[in-house]
Amino acid sequence: MSLLLLVVSALHILILILLFVATLDKSWWTLPGKESLNLWYDCTWNSDNKTWACSNVSENGWLKAVQVLMVLSLILCCLSFILFMFQLYTMRRGGLFYATGFCQLCTSVAVFTGALIYAIHAEEILADRPSGGSFGYCFALAWVAFPLALASGIIYIHLRKRE
């Protein structure tokens, strides 16, 4: 049982790390010439002084929706981890982790919706940018976090506390 709890906790921490990097790092979209866009800033690499020059992204409504959903997924994932720890130490033997599982399932839905909106509306979000480019690694990390959060939520729902 302790090995299972360790694996579930490690999976949850991995999902948290993936969501933090996907939400806060600077590569949701990469353009030719070392320019990248994330959910918050448009960054260009300045090779003269070897720094990133960043400016705020556009006020596109779809981008705002993606920002909100990714922050919501982070909040829900943190909440579910705290809830898991609380239930682990206070719940009686034989209890199920339904609340934790439900929070993780909501996390996976929020990540899925945010990444899907970004994928579908990328042309509108990037309308004032030059053509070309591709999705960055943060976008891929969001897609990796989705099935992991979904699996984690299902595991939590079926997990029963034992002594």
UniProtKB/Swiss-Prot annotation:
Protein name: Epithelial membrane protein 3
Main location class: membrane
Glycosylation sites recorded in the entry for this protein: 49, 56
UniProt record, GO biological process: apoptotic process; bleb assembly
UniProtKB keywords: Glycoprotein, Membrane, Transmembrane, Transmembrane helix
Membrane topology: Multi-pass membrane protein
Keyword rRNA-binding in record: no
GO cellular component, one term: plasma membrane
Locations listed in the record: Membrane
Function of the molecule: Probably involved in cell proliferation and cell-cell interactions.
A Pfam family reported for this protein in Swiss-Prot or TrEMBL: PMP22_Claudin
InterPro entries per the UniProt record, alphabetical: EMP_3, PMP-22/EMP/MP20-like, PMP22/EMP/MP20/Claudin, PMP22_EMP_MP20
Keyword hit for Membrane: yes
Annotated family: Belongs to the PMP-22/EMP/MP20 family.
Stretches that traverse the bilayer: 4-24, 66-86, 100-120, 139-159
